[in-house]
Each structure stands twice: as C-alpha cells, then as structure tokens.
Amino acid sequence: MAALSAPGLCGFRILGLRSSVGTAVQARGVHQSVATDGPSSTQPALPKARAVAPKPSSRGEYVVAKLDDLVNWARRSSLWPMTFGLACCAVEMMHMAAPRYDMDRFGVVFRASPRQSDVMIVAGTLTNKMAPALRKVYDQMPEPRYVVSMGSCANGGGYYHYSYSVVRGCDRIVPVDIYIPGCPPTAEALLYGILQLQRKIKRERRLQIWYRR
C-alpha cells in the first residue's frame, strides 16, 4: 500500500510544480508588459527639456576669464583711496602713507576727490551728524567702489558704542568690504587690510557673471 501511494504522491508534486511554474511565467509576462512601457536598455529614454540655458563655449569662457584677470590686475594695482579721517585712526593712516611703509609701492595713492577714488577708508568714530556726509561722498565715487572700516569705532562704535550720538558701525551707512580691528590699529594692520582688499579684487569675476547672463 505504501508502494502504491508513492507514485501518486510524486504525481501530485509534479502537478504542483507545473502550476507554480505556470504562475511564475504569467507573473513574469505581466512584469515584462509593464516594464516595456517605460525606457529600457533597448529603448533609449527621450531627452528631458532643460530649464537652464546651455553653457557658453569653452573658448568664450577662456577669453572672458583672461579679461577678468587683466582688469582685476589693473584695478588692484592702482587703488586710489578717498581719505575719510574722523579720529585718531587717521594718524595711523597718515603713518602708512609715510616713507617708512611707502604705500605708493602697492599702487595706493590718496585722492582728495571722490570722483577720482575707488576706495574709501573710514578711519575713526562716525557720528550721527557725519553719517549723511559719509553716504554722500560714497555715492559720488564711481563703480566699482570699496570701503575699508579702520578701527573699533568705525567697526562697531568702539569705546563710544553706547553714546547717543555715535553710529554703531559704519556698515549701517555704507557696505564695508574690509574690517580692520584695533583701537587704533597700527599702520601695519592697515597695510595688511589693503593687501586683503587686493586679494578680494583678484578673485572677482564681474565679466564672467555678465557673460553668463
């Protein structure tokens, strides 16, 4: 009896295996039919619409980059500051212009007119009554223009921070590029600030930004 039941059991197993194989083949066919709707290795995907403008040619980028380097070299090598001495920091600014440090060797030449200047050195305490004059002189400077805040009083009010008549930082009136700490900062510190401004100008990419628009 046991010998007779073994072939029947094998038949049931074979039928069950066939049914499972048939179900797997049907499921595979369903998955293949769904997958063929989208892109596959044999069916290339359609290119998507680009929302960003195409990049310019490498030759144009190279020419504009070299022009930027040339303009930045000329600009940082001939900084003409507009002196705006307000307090004791101006004495150290004059010290930097003396023969000991000789700022002329860096191309820094003081100008008396804002029309001929591209840098303003705010040296000293800025009061509320002086703030409109500072802004007026800044507006008369041609673009591009830079501002150097020299000393603690120009940076944030300094010793007179809580005074009713003092502006707590000249960056509330004009945009500042370089801050020089100290009360007062030495001539070496101001010279270092000028060198940092030259490094900042060297990294500018004005023409490249204009070219990519």
Curated annotation (Swiss-Prot):
- Taxonomic superkingdom: Eukaryota
Tell me how this protein sits in the membrane: Peripheral membrane protein
Q: How is the cofactor bound?
A: Binds 1 [4Fe-4S] cluster.
Q: Hydroxyarginine occurs at which residues?
A: 111
One GO biological-process annotation of the entry reads:
mitochondrial respiratory chain complex I assembly
Residues annotated as binding [4Fe-4S] cluster = 88-89, 153, 183
Its required cofactor(s), as named, are: [4Fe-4S] cluster
Cellular component terms per the entry's GO annotation: mitochondrial inner membrane; respiratory chain complex I
What EC designation does it have? 7.1.1.2
Residue ranges annotated as compositionally biased, kind Polar residues, are 33-44
**Alphabetized InterPro entries for the sequence:** NADH_UbQ_OxRdtase-like_20kDa, NADH_UQ_OxRdtase_20Kd_su
Q: Which UniProt keywords apply?
A: 4Fe-4S, Electron transport, Hydroxylation, Iron, Iron-sulfur, Membrane, Metal-binding, Mitochondrion, Mitochondrion inner membrane, NAD, Oxidoreductase, Respiratory chain, Transit peptide, Translocase, Transport, Ubiquinone
- Pfam families under this entry? Oxidored_q6 (PF01058)
Subcellular localization: Mitochondrion inner membrane
User: Reaction catalysed by this chain?
Assistant: a ubiquinone + NADH + 5 H(+)(in) = a ubiquinol + NAD(+) + 4 H(+)(out)
Molecular function terms from GO: 4 iron, 4 sulfur cluster binding; metal ion binding; NADH dehydrogenase (ubiquinone) activity; quinone binding
- Map out region (Disordered) in residue numbers: 32-53
Q: How is it modified after translation?
A: Hydroxylated ar Arg-111 by NDUFAF5 early in the pathway of assembly of complex I, before the formation of the juncture between peripheral and membrane arms.
Residue ranges annotated as coiled coil are none
Which proteins does it associate with, and in what oligomeric form? Answer: Core subunit of respiratory chain NADH dehydrogenase (Complex I) which is composed of 45 different subunits. This is a component of the iron-sulfur (IP) fragment of the enzyme.
Q: What is this protein called?
A: NADH dehydrogenase [ubiquinone] iron-sulfur protein 7, mitochondrial
Species of provenance: Gorilla gorilla gorilla (Western lowland gorilla)
